Amino acid sequence: MNNIIAQQIADQGGVEAWLHAQQHKSLLRFLTCGSVDDGKSTLIGRLLHDTRQIYEDQLSSLHNDSKRHGTQGEKLDLALLVDGLQAEREQGITIDVAYRYFSTEKRKFIIADTPGHEQYTRNMATGASTCDLAILLIDARKGVLDQTRRHSFISTLLGIKHLVVAINKMDLVDYSQATFEQIKQDYLDFATQLPGNLDIRFVPLSALEGENVAAPSGHMGWYSGPTLLDVLETVEVQRVVEQQPMRFPVQYVNRPNLDFRGYAGTLASGSVQVGQRVKVLPSGVESSIARIVTFDGDLQQAAAGEAITLVLKDEIDISRGDLLVDASAELTPVRAATVDVVWMAEQPLAPGQSFDVKIAGKKTRARVKGIQHQVEINSLTQHSIAELPLNAIGLVDIVFDEPMVLDSYQQNPVTGGMIFIDRLSNVTVGAGMIRQPLAEETAAGSTDFSAFELELNALVRRHFPHWNARDLLGGK
């Protein structure tokens, strides 16, 4: 146990009181990203060090590792606290997404340290998918680079609305205000191309020297704003799911005995209360909430993010992957959607390919109808492409094998997010953010099957009726 935790336990009157206080602190998930060697891992190490989250044995080990692998001379190489893979330490870069946890008196934090290299875009997208805020590091000597633009675009694409632009290594430019202001203006000019209403803040700092990270800098009197830690402790994160209508994807049908039948899952958005009329999709059958069951007892009301089991008044057919919504919700199941795809496989994504896809617990099959364009994520320009290569991002048309209930990703990341799974290897090969579900008539009117596909479909339906294959032309 480190000294600061021991002191907090003593101040709060024991372990139980301390644990209770920790449990009720708000949680902020954020990621650090930027160009290679901008100091992402060093910044996280500095946050852990200055908030006294490092144990004595870790600090001793860090001194030894700094002498062996360090790049900071006689100083502690704080990046070694989070660069855990041997390849990372030897190359001085981050490869994997490294998660770290720390807390202050005001808040708990989960940090995702993401790779800066372009070939690890898929790792960065994975880290960003669960975060509320992104820290974009910029080397004060280099300014806004292509990778800064790329990480900004990916962060906003994945729904992050709060961006903190940390202009690092200010010690190497003599803490110049003019340098800071120029980089700030350059980034604001670029940010006009990013989607959504963004909360962008700028902090000049030196992660290596600890300037403006957890304590104010003594060398930047011209900066009167908060430190980076102050920003993290006080930012008010508006989670989209709390303001959206009720969405409850069923993950598991809980039937421990003949007297109980409940539907377990995590409430994706909105709220639900006992007595509320709900509708099951895609069937459209309605019922009302009889009980909201949790491990700690029944609730009268539940909010987004809570893991609950819903018991309905009526016995109706519900299975894993079905979606419970408010009875007044007007949602129509669709068979097609346009999707922003981050491709994660060595083999390119191409029209005509089929994959298993998973959306909010529901697994089905989907076919790539076409690729509208690829986004050049360094310049945010769009261009036509026949195939989507590894680490590329593009807008793709998808056709599902069965009706799906979808939201756009910006409205609801749970019911608007999806993964592509290779049907042979069962490996996740892509991540998708639904931009727009397509109405049935739009999808049907734009479908263009080859003669071979139509002939094969007819043969399968004639000779293998037990497969229940759908008529591609829309017949019975």
UniProtKB/Swiss-Prot annotation:
Domain tr-type G: 25-241
GO MF term (any one): sulfate adenylyltransferase (ATP) activity
Complex formation: Heterodimer composed of CysD, the smaller subunit, and CysN.
Protein name: Sulfate adenylyltransferase subunit 1
Keyword ATP-binding attributed: yes
Task of the protein: With CysD forms the ATP sulfurylase (ATPS) that catalyzes the adenylation of sulfate producing adenosine 5'-phosphosulfate (APS) and diphosphate, the first enzymatic step in sulfur assimilation pathway. APS synthesis involves the formation of a high-energy phosphoric-sulfuric acid anhydride bond driven by GTP hydrolysis by CysN coupled to ATP hydrolysis by CysD.
Region (G1): 34-41
InterPro entries: CysN_GTP-bd (IPR041757), CysN_II (IPR044138), CysN_NoDQ_III (IPR044139), G_TR_CS (IPR031157), GTP-eEF1A_C (IPR054696), P-loop_NTPase (IPR027417), Small_GTP-bd (IPR005225), SO4_adenylTrfase_lsu (IPR011779)
Enzyme Commission no: 2.7.7.4
Species in which this protein is naturally found: Erwinia tasmaniensis (strain DSM 17950 / CFBP 7177 / CIP 109463 / NCPPB 4357 / Et1/99)
Classification via CDD domains: CysN_ATPS, CysN_NodQ_II, CysN_NoDQ_III
Region (G5): 206-208
Enzyme class: transferase
